[in-house]
Amino acid sequence: MFSVLSCGRLVARAVFGGLSQTDSRDYSLVTASCGFGKDARKGILKKGMCYGDDACFIARHRTADVLGVADGVGGWRDYGVDPSQFSETLMRTCERLVKEGRFVPTNPVGILTSSYRELLQNKVPLLGSSTACLVVLDRTSHRLHTANLGDSGFLVVRAGEVVHRSDEQQHYFNTPFQLSIAPPEAEGAVLSDSPDAADSNSFDVQLGDIILTATDGLFDNMPDYMILQELKKLKNTNYESIQQTARSIAEQAHDLAYDPNYMSPFAQFACDYGLNVRGGKPDDITVLLSIVAEYTD
């Protein structure tokens, strides 16, 4: 079987310390990215940090590390619209705003709002829809600020246990909250949520905490216990080890997505709605795997 996997990483200078907190130290995220496009079996892969209709970004600023994932809604393809354009442009805009310092670390919803507003104001309409999940680490306060709209999301793992996670937002089965831009004649007929509808949260993190941010292609195919099993293999806190683990998670999710006999989380969710579904859920998969580390300039 021929498949294509793309992996990337953000090389940040960081020194890993113990698990004890020291207020005088700044923190950073050391992040690796891996993913599959749904059509990866055909050997088709987009350039950059885009996997099928998924997109992601990793950005650094002197005050914070910021990362995000977005999942373009594939249904737009039926109307001749490339779903990846919306998610990719949304993430690139978020990335640019962060690098330009046009954001407040405590307000990731603000980043999403500003980026979405720019898309709305484009002279050439950019049609489409997307979920979005943003994670911001404030270096000095050691607090993680998050915003999640839809069914992408994040996990924070400490000592092998999930200590924080995002809440999935669905209007109804398999219909997540989403940002949308519709043609004028279809406004009001296309499902669209406000960035303010995103579920936001803030909490302290510790050195060595693992943060996994991903699109639903991961969570629909791998339950928490499988993800935690893979994270246990992360023995070394160097970039190569983080990237290898991110790759292993993405590969396993991709394999399970095409297993017709596997009772996936998505299939279990469908059964809760009275649907007779079995097997994995073929989808684009994007995984950002981060470790909280001590920051050195």
UniProtKB/Swiss-Prot annotation:
Residues that bind Mn(2+) 2: D71, D216
Keywords linked to the UniProt accession: Hydrolase, Magnesium, Manganese, Metal-binding, Mitochondrion, Protein phosphatase, Transit peptide
Annotated GO biological process: regulation of ubiquinone biosynthetic process
Cystine pairings recorded for this chain: none
Superkingdom per UniProt: Eukaryota
Gene3D superfamilies in UniProt: PPM-type phosphatase domain
UniProt binding sites for Mn(2+) 1: D71, G72
Targeting signal (transit peptide) range: 1-27
Reaction it catalyzes: O-phospho-L-seryl-[protein] + H2O = L-seryl-[protein] + phosphate; O-phospho-L-threonyl-[protein] + H2O = L-threonyl-[protein] + phosphate
Entry similarity comment: Belongs to the PP2C family.
Name assigned to this protein: Protein phosphatase PTC7 homolog
